[in-house]
Amino acid sequence: AMLEQLHVDVLDLGIVRDDPAALEAALRDAVARDADAVITSGGVSVGEADFTRDVMARLGEVTFASLALRPGRPLAVGTLARGDGAPGHALFFGLPGNPVASAVTFDAIVRAALLTLAGACVPPPAMYTAYTTQALKKRAGRTEYLRGIATRAADGRWHVAPAGSQSSASLSGLAAANCFIVLGHDAAAVDAGAPVDILPFGSPI
């Protein structure tokens, strides 16, 4: 659905089992079909069944494999060679398997890359200032995207509260939210009533 909002042509190659050979075959198939970008979900962490980064390294180049981002730390970004001596390459984005982490990394990284690839002029994130109605826990050293519900008060100021569960595996909070609460890399815990940045859903990145 997030890809369709960008009006790109989507080629769904289905579900690939946790097997290096099957994954390699699927990625080779994708680039053979002249895909400009290949996006996968899951298999990018360091578990026994996580093969994406190794296969990606064999078929192309891994630019980076993790981010100081929550949710969304495991993320593989790089390129896949066309193979058989064909020129050029396809961009590759290996997103986390947890659905919320996948949505966050798509919004934070993939959306802008695909729009740029399509030749669009990509504006900076449309951030707004809101005042949190609750204290927010945060550890400095990583950027955090909390799912939030923003409302506008009579005085014109935005107020925001966390939307349900903030687990990266829980879709309920994401479904209830209308924005991300973006807490910067160096920020620590936030007191109730403090200003924070929010990124409304549907804002261009």
Label every PLM stretch briefly.
Residues A1-T40:
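Phosphate-binding glycine-rich loops and their immediate beta-loop-alpha structural context
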Residues D9, A35, T40-T52, V62, ...:
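Glycine-rich beta-strand-to-loop/alpha-helix junction loops that act as flexible
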Residues L13-V16, G42, L95, L183:
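Active-site-adjacent beta-strand anchor residues
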Residues V55-I205:
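Flexible glycine/proline-rich
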Residues V16-R28, V46-L67, P74:
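Short catalytic-site patches enriched in acidic/histidine residues
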Residues I15-D18, V44-G47, A101-S102, A188:
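Glycine-/small-residue-rich active-site loops that bind phosphorylated ligands and cofactors
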